[in-house]
Amino acid sequence: MNTAGPAGKLAGHAASGPTQRQLRVGEEVRRMLADLFARTEFRDPELVDVRITVTEVRISPDLKHATAFVARLGRSDVETLLPALKRVAPFLRSRLSTGLRLRGVPEIHFQPDTALDYAMEVDALLRQPDVARDLD
C-alpha cells in the first residue's frame, strides 16, 4: 500500500524544511515588520529612537506562529529589548492583519539574531597574528 501524498511525500513524515508557503509568508511578514520598525514611533520608552532590523522570520507549519530574528543597528544589546518587543507584539500583529492575505495573522515571537556577532567573533579570531600565520 502506497501512503505517498502530494509531491511523493510519505504521509505522517515531517518535511525536511519549510514549505514554499512558509517561506513566502515568512518573507512577507519580515518585510512588513521591517517597514513597521522603520516608520513607527513606538510609545514604549525602551523603543524610542531605537533602530531595529528584522533579519529573518520563520513561520510554523500551521502559520499560527512567526519567530522574528531581530538585530539592533549599531549595537549588540538586542536581548535587552526583547521584553519591550514582546509588549508591542500585539500592536504589530494588528498592523500585519491589514496587509497579510491570510485567514489568521501569526502570533509574533522575537529572538535575537546572533549571526552577525558570531561572524565578527570568527573574523577577529582569524585576524589574530598566530592564527593568520597558520593560515598562510
Curated annotation (Swiss-Prot):
Gene3D superfamilies: 3.30.300.20
GO CC term, one of those recorded: cytosol
UniProt-listed Pfam families: RBFA
Compartment(s) of residence: Cytoplasm
One GO-annotated biological process of the protein: maturation of SSU-rRNA
A single GO molecular function term of this UniProt record: ribosomal small subunit binding
Residue ranges, annotated region (Disordered): 1-22
Subunit (UniProt): Monomer. Binds 30S ribosomal subunits, but not 50S ribosomal subunits or 70S ribosomes.
UniProt cross-references to PANTHER family, sorted A to Z: RIBOSOME-BINDING FACTOR A, CHLOROPLASTIC-RELATED (PTHR33515:SF1)
Name this polypeptide is given: Ribosome-binding factor A
Source organism of this protein record: Gluconacetobacter diazotrophicus (strain ATCC 49037 / DSM 5601 / CCUG 37298 / CIP 103539 / LMG 7603 / PAl5)
